[in-house]
Amino acid sequence: MGLYASANHNLIHDHFLKEIGCRSTVRIENHHNFAWEQDGAYIHRKGATPSGVGEIGIIPGSMGTNSYVVAGKGNIHSIQSSSHGAGRVSSRTQAKKNLDRTAFKQLVEANDIVTAGVAADETNQAYKDIERVIQLQVDDGVLTPIFKMIPKIVIMGNANKRGNELDRVVS
């Protein structure tokens, strides 16, 4: 992540923590479209994150599904890389066409998830099953899950638009 993006994320996190009266005990930056110099060569990870021995990373799920903090195992067969997320099951255009709005609303309500700025192509229906994605990487010796995060608030870039039918804002 570039310095500008990193600083911006830190500001967002600092403001959020202040508003909810909490403090951070650790910060994890997770690059997923970046080139690293390693052993005299460059490794470009597009949609993948470093997963060296003990390297801490985040593998996000989607709106309504778990995300994971993981530790890498340095698997050379995966070029010491793990997935950055569940991965899409379809293109953004197709995801918008296939979205079952009723099912999405039922999911966020049943799990008491507050959403703002939801994009139709970013719902859980657009992604693979995160539990299976994590398990496959565990089975292949790529990573070890440290803990899972269960979504309660999802805020996306369109959060300031009014009237988004997919938003579930609780006042």
For the regions a protein language model found, what residue spans apply to each?
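Domain-length cofactor-binding catalytic modules of enzymes
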Residues: 1-171
